């Protein structure tokens, strides 16, 4: 149990630092759509889709790796709270179209990335 807790801790810390770095680097690129947050959410969705496809196929892999990558890293990398706050800020500024676009891109994009990664890695593992 301690090993699993440490895996979540290390993965979560690493994912959080990665999200912060993406936000610092890419959020200033667009005034209405926080590109860093979007990138973190889409990348996390892709990684978790890939991870679930991989771990479903490779049942012999230590469960510690699954929680390190999915619960830890992806949990730290992706962020619903920051995304929600950024949408609220856009709404407060009266930028309703940008707020709606941000919601649609994050939600639909995340679903699409998870499905794409799961499909790609399931197909690759089947070969």
Swiss-Prot record:
It holds the Pfam family CRCB. GO terms for molecular function: fluoride channel activity; fluoride transmembrane transporter activity; metal ion binding. GO terms for cellular component: plasma membrane. It comes from the Bacteria. PANTHER family: FLUORIDE EXPORT PROTEIN 1-RELATED. Na(+) binds at residues 75, 78. InterPro entries: FluC. It comes from Salmonella typhimurium (strain LT2 / SGSC1412 / ATCC 700720). Fluoride-specific ion channel. Important for reducing fluoride concentration in the cell, thus reducing its toxicity. It is found in: Cell inner membrane. It is a multi-pass membrane protein. Belongs to the fluoride channel Fluc/FEX (TC 1.A.43) family. It catalyses: fluoride(in) = fluoride(out). The gene is fluC. The chain crosses the membrane at residues 4-24, 35-55, 71-91, 103-123. Keywords: Cell inner membrane, Cell membrane, Ion channel, Ion transport, Membrane, Metal-binding, Sodium, Transmembrane, Transmembrane helix, Transport. One of its GO terms (biological process) is cellular detoxification of fluoride. The keyword Cell membrane applies. Na(+) is not transported, but it plays an essential structural role and its presence is essential for fluoride channel function. This is Fluoride-specific ion channel FluC.
């Amino acid at each position: 149990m301690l090993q699993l807790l440490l895996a979540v801790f290390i993965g979560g810390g690493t994912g959080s630092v990665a999200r912060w770095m993406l936000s610092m680097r890419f959020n200033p690129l667009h005034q209405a759509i926080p590109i860093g947050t979007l990138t973190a959410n889409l990348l996390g969705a892709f990684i978790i889709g890939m991870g679930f496809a991989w771990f479903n196929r490779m049942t012999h892999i230590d469960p510690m790796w699954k929680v390190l990558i999915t619960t830890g890293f992806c949990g730290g990398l992706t962020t619903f709270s920051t995304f929600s706050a950024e949408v609220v800020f856009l709404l407060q500024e009266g930028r309703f179209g940008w707020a709606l676009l941000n919601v649609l891109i994050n939600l639909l994009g995340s679903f699409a990335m998870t499905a794409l990664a799961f499909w790609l890695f399931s197909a690759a593992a089947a070969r």
